[in-house]
């Protein structure tokens, strides 16, 4: 079946046009296109058309913690949020450190069929930081794993990290680092600063992140490797990234929506929903992260979507499991923090939420131009809509959103994966 998207503005630019999708590709773009007899018509008058979003950092919890999320519910949240591809992190149970697990995740994602679920392979066996996994076997498997990370913990041994970068370079795959020097964060649950001191919470210094980013930039330089920094959170990290890029080092970085919008003032409530790793930092850090995303020092937005069940969050702050939902709220938070103040345009949104992450992960069919003949991985956005976040109404199996009851701008009105409508008007299209 073909799909006709009526009255849309590609990249939010120019006059309204119709876009005809047929056989998984963009077939025609132009004003007042004829409606094919079998076409599914989407009235998107005045809406913005973007390439489907790509999330380099999600936690879908399958296998092992399906009570908090699974690939089906996570895929639904992703499609409703405008995503056509997501990367599922390796800290599952069992850990995704072998083709048995990574291929399962890939096949399950294909079975659900709402987004392309790309498994992230572990860098070290069991995330223990001691022995490299068989990255080559995972890359050669059905999932063709192209990114590896011990996210949740840092590959803190510099020799292991150096060997991982060298191994990855030979395979043409990417190492994504959770930048946290663990000896600086023992017992830490909040950003090290006045707020943590006032609340009596153990502090997590910026240097724990900055020191690993600096170290890994140098290791990547010497190995001739690519390295990707997960969830940058500190202003000092921005300065290190800028220095490394100026040196020609192949380093990329992501920022989460929650680090763009929120800061550690929220911790005053002691609500476990606000506990996340790395922690919410000071308002000045959020300002620096927004500017870095606008300037291209930070390359992309990634959600770090991390579902947790109620019993894991509704406890005292230090005992709460770290992490927040992000897939369905990501676009709206980026619009509020970046588009509304004029830091990014809609074309820039395509760059940081689709094109750059697809390029970083080397996905050939995602983040493509909105042109005839290109794959129809598409997101339609109503830029003028507003909505109120209610965790219980989100598609995720968990409800741990830090944006509960917030009014946010912009809604995803349709998502298409290879020409198939996966989500429309807030509902999944199976």
Curated annotation (Swiss-Prot):
One GO BP annotation here? Answer: purine nucleobase catabolic process
Known cofactor(s): Zn(2+)
Q: What class of enzyme is it?
A: hydrolase
Please name the pathway.
Pyrimidine metabolism; UMP biosynthesis via de novo pathway; (S)-dihydroorotate from bicarbonate: step 3/3
Q: Where is the active site?
A: 304
Binding residues for substrate: 59-61, 91, 277, 308, 322-323
- Gene Ontology molecular-function annotations: allantoinase activity; dihydroorotase activity; zinc ion binding
Keywords on record: Hydrolase, Metal-binding, Pyrimidine biosynthesis, Zinc
Entry EC no(s): 3.5.2.3
Gene Ontology cellular component annotations, sorted alphabetically: cytoplasm
Task: Give the protein's biological function.
Answer: Catalyzes the reversible cyclization of carbamoyl aspartate to dihydroorotate.
Similarity-based family: Belongs to the metallo-dependent hydrolases superfamily. DHOase family. Class I DHOase subfamily.
Name of the molecule in the record: Dihydroorotase
């Amino acid at each position: 079946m073909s799909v006709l998207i009526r009255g849309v503005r590609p990249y939010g630019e120019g006059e309204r046009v119709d876009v005809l999708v047929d056989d998984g590709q963009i077939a025609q773009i132009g004003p007042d296109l004829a409606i094919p007899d079998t076409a599914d018509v989407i009235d998107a008058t005045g809406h913005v058309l973007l390439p489907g979003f790509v999330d380099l950092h999600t936690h879908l919890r399958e296998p092992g913690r399906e009570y908090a999320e699974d690939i089906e519910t996570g895929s639904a949240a992703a499609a409703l949020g405008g995503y056509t591809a997501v990367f599922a992190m390796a800290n599952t149970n069992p850990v995704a450190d072998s083709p048995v697990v990574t291929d399962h995740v890939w096949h399950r994602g294909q079975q659900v069929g709402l987004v392309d679920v790309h498994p992230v392979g572990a860098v070290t066996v069991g995330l223990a930081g001691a022995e490299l996994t068989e990255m080559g076997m995972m890359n050669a498997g059905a999932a063709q794993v192209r990114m590896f990370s011990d996210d949740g913990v840092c590959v803190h041994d510099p020799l292991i990290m150096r060997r991982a970068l060298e191994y990855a370079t030979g395979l043409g795959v990417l190492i994504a680092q959770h930048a946290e020097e663990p000896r600086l964060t023992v017992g830490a649950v909040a950003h090290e600063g006045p707020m943590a001191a006032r609340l009596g919470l153990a502090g997590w210094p910026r240097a724990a992140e900055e020191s690993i980013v600096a170290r890994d930039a140098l290791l990547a330089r010497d190995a001739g490797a690519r390295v990707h920094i997960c969830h940058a959170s500190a202003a000092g990290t921005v300065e290190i990234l800028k220095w490394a890029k100026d040196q020609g080092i192949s380093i990329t970085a992501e920022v989460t929506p929650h680090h763009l919008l929120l800061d550690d003032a929220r911790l005053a409530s002691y609500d476990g929903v606000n506990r996340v790793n790395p922690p919410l930092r000071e308002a000045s850090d959020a300002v620096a992260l927004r500017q870095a995303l606008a300037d291209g020092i930070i390359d992309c937005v990634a959600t770090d979507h991390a579902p947790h069940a109620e019993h894991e969050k509704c406890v005292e702050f230090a005992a709460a499991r770290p992490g927040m939902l992000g897939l369905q709220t990501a676009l709206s938070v980026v619009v509020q923090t970046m588009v509304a103040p004029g830091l990014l345009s809609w074309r820039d949104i395509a760059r940081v939420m689709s094109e750059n992450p697809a390029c970083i992960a080397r996905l050939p069919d995602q983040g493509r131009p909105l042109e005839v003949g290109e794959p129809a991985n598409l997101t339609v956005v109503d830029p003028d809509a507003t909505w109120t976040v209610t965790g219980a109404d989100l598609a995720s199996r968990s409800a741990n959103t830090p944006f509960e009851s917030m009014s946010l701008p912009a809604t995803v009105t349709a998502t298409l994966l290879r020409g198939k409508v996966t989500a429309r008007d807030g509902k999944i299209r199976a």
